[in-house]
Regions:
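A glycine-rich, basic-preceded beta-loop-alpha segment at the flavin cofactor/substrate interface
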Residues: 192-194, 229-241, 246, 253-284, ...
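A short core secondary-structure module
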Residues: 182-183, 187-235
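C-terminal amphipathic alpha-helical interaction region
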Residues: 440, 456-563
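Alpha-helix capping/hinge segments and adjacent helical runs
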Residues: 249, 366, 370-448, 532-560
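Internal maturation/activation junctions in enzymes
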Residues: 62, 126-127, 138-175, 189, ...
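Amphipathic, small/basic residue-rich leader segments at the start of a protein or domain
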Residues: 1-121, 145, 547, 553-563
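A structural-propensity feature for long, helix-poor, extended segments
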Residues: 128-130, 139-142, 146, 425, ...
Length: 563
């Protein structure tokens, strides 16, 4: 299937980015011609090299053989094509070995690669984000060795946090780090480690949170780099205990890894592990957004092609008509298209704001970062749920055919279900939005969003619709702010509040598409999706507002039901 449609949409979104003028000032050497060339080359690689691998990765999957993970034939060649093309280096500064391009451009490319194969693309993000983190905080000797190796793809990285009794509750981690004659050593077991072992690169660096002192909670945690092989090439005491047999993402080996006094290197200050790791985690959460949009785009395009080709119904005296002519199929397709285009716009806007948080004039960065922290849970979780919902919707359009492996929709459905689980579940993102972004930050990011979004309002009907939703979000936030002293009351509506924020940000993106997308075929296509979204906007916003402010009364039946 051609990637031209997706490429056209991405390039149009990039041409109408919010805060584009500020981004141009922050990246004066980055021009539209370069952006177009990069996106088009990414599409070629995705379509020609990565896409054909996905069915093989899914069908064969990674295997554990004699204690080592073996990937499927062709996986190594695909990885080599990605890294030799320099695709891990796009957003890093030249002095760090990168190309100095904006993060938003990397986000656009990630969407294309994830559309081709989410399982394949998952390996790239930890290495790139770990390299960026090391470039900022690691000791020179470690930085000078590991950063270029990670960016070249010769070595790869994992992020090791979860344990059997400590997933989202990081403060309960029990893996221990102790000093032995000046050498740090870690002992414990980590689970859910994506690409925890493989045969695609020569060395794997595990970036791990471990308890280095008896200080309570996260204050006792430090960040360590634990290589699977030591500098002399011998194996570290790192053992792959099993790989998980999963619903989807079969080509991405998810490992349980044991560490038995494994040699480790401290990254950053002792006792500041979570704080040191946090920038890497934020970057990985951002990458979840183009991951979800890419998978959703693949499912949507399959459904659209099928609906145009499949013939059923119509006048009994005439030949059957394409099912795309039926009103309910049109509704389904437009509903999926609206969500995909809006999520794409949110992902790119979030990446743009993160770019400005690190590259705008120093005095402006704090404001951009506050806005980024508001947008990030929306982009991450909205796109994660989008991927599964659109895959399910595409299956519905295909009918029984979609339920078979003859079509790739069921693979998208299986692969995407976990997106709203890893890198912070929906509930975790919702609590982050309520407790941190609204209460702790006093709604600073939300307020900045409202100021900037309202600046795009005009006097037309679309602006009136979006403006009313912005007002509704503001009043709902004020209600929840007043419940800060009764968090249990507010927590019952946290997910609804996150969704209301997403609806409002989506309304802003839809309004901008309607204003700026252009009058050619690509612009008309994007505007059709945006107008469908805007038509449902007041209904969706009102429903989420009511759920968000209903309070804990809606949960009163749980004791009786669970008894």
């Amino acid at each position: 299937m051609s990637y031209a449609r997706q490429t056209d949409a991405l390039l149009r979104h990039l041409s109408i980015l919010p805060f584009g003028d500020a981004l141009e000032r922050a990246f004066p050497d980055s021009d539209p011609e370069t952006w177009t060339a990069v996106v088009e080359q990414a599409a070629l690689l995705a379509e020609a090299v990565i896409d054909p691998l996905d069915a093989v990765l899914d069908g064969l999957g990674a295997r554990l053989v004699d204690g080592r993970v073996r990937c499927v034939p062709g996986h190594r060649a695909g990885w080599d094509a990605l890294v030799h093309g320099g695709w891990l280096t796009l957003p890093l500064a030249p002095e760090q070995g990168g190309q100095g391009l904006p993060l938003v451009l990397n986000t656009a490319c990630e969407e294309l690669f994830n559309r081709a194969s989410a399982a394949f693309t998952m390996l790239a993000t930890p290495g790139r984000t770990a390299a960026a983190m090391l470039a900022g905080v690691a000791e020179p000797a470690l930085r000078e060795v590991w950063v270029p190796k990670l960016l070249s793809g010769e070595w790869t990285a994992t992020i090791c946090i979860s344990e059997a009794d400590a997933g989202s509750d990081v403060a309960r981690l029990r893996t221990r780090a102790t000093q032995d004659g000046g050498q740090w050593r870690v002992t414990g077991e980590k689970i859910w480690i994506s690409y925890g072992d493989h045969d695609l690169a020569g060395r794997i660096g595990h970036f791990m949170l471990a308890r280095s002192s008896d200080a309570a909670g996260v204050r006792g945690l430090s960040l360590f780099l634990v290589p699977d092989r030591l500098d002399d090439g011998t194996r570290n005491t790192v053992e792959v205990r099993r790989i998980e047999h999963k619903l989807g993402l079969h080509g991405s080996p998810t490992c349980v890894i044991g560490f038995d006094g494994a040699a480790a290197m401290l990254i950053g200050a002792e006792g500041r592990g979570l704080q040191t790791l946090f920038p890497m985690m934020l970057q990985m959460r951002l990458s979840c957004a183009p991951q979800g949009v890419g998978v959703a785009e693949a499912a949507l395009e399959t459904a659209l092609d099928y609906a145009q080709a499949r013939r059923q119904g119509g006048d009994a005296a005439a030949p059957p008509v394409p099912i795309v002519t039926h009103a309910d199929v049109q509704r389904q397709l437009l509903a999926m298209a609206a969500r995909v285009e809006i999520a794409r716009g949110i992902a790119l806007a979030t990446a743009t704001v993160m770019d400005l948080g690190s590259h705008a004039p120093e005095a402006e960065r704090a404001g951009w970062l506050m806005l980024a922290h508001f947008l990030l849970p929306i982009a991450k979780d909205g796109s994660a749920r989008l991927a599964f919902d659109v895959s399910s919707g595409a299956l519905q359009v295909l009918g029984g055919a979609g339920y078979t492996r003859e079509w790739p929709v069921e693979r998208r459905l299986r692969d995407s279900r976990v997106f709203a689980v890893f890198e912070g579940t929906t509930g975790i993102q919702a609590i982050d939005m309520l407790h941190r972004r609204l209460w702790r930050d006093r709604g600073g990011g939300l307020s900045r969003f409202l100021i900037l979004a309202r600046a795009d309002l005009g006097t037309d009907a679309r602006s009136a619709t979006a403006g009313a939703v912005f007002d509704l979000l503001e009043t709902t936030a004020a209600t929840l702010m007043a419940w800060e002293t009764d968090p249990q009351e507010a927590d019952a509506g946290a997910t609804a509040f996150l969704d209301l924020c997403g609806v409002a940000v989506g309304g802003w993106i839809a309004l901008r598409i309607s204003l700026f997308a252009g009058e050619d075929a690509v612009g008309r296509r994007l505007r059709a999706a945006a107008d469908f979204y805007l038509a449902d906007l007041p209904i969706a916003a009102e429903a989420e507002m009511r759920r968000a402010t209903q309070g804990s009364v809606r949960l009163k039946g749980i004791d009786a039901y669970a008894a």
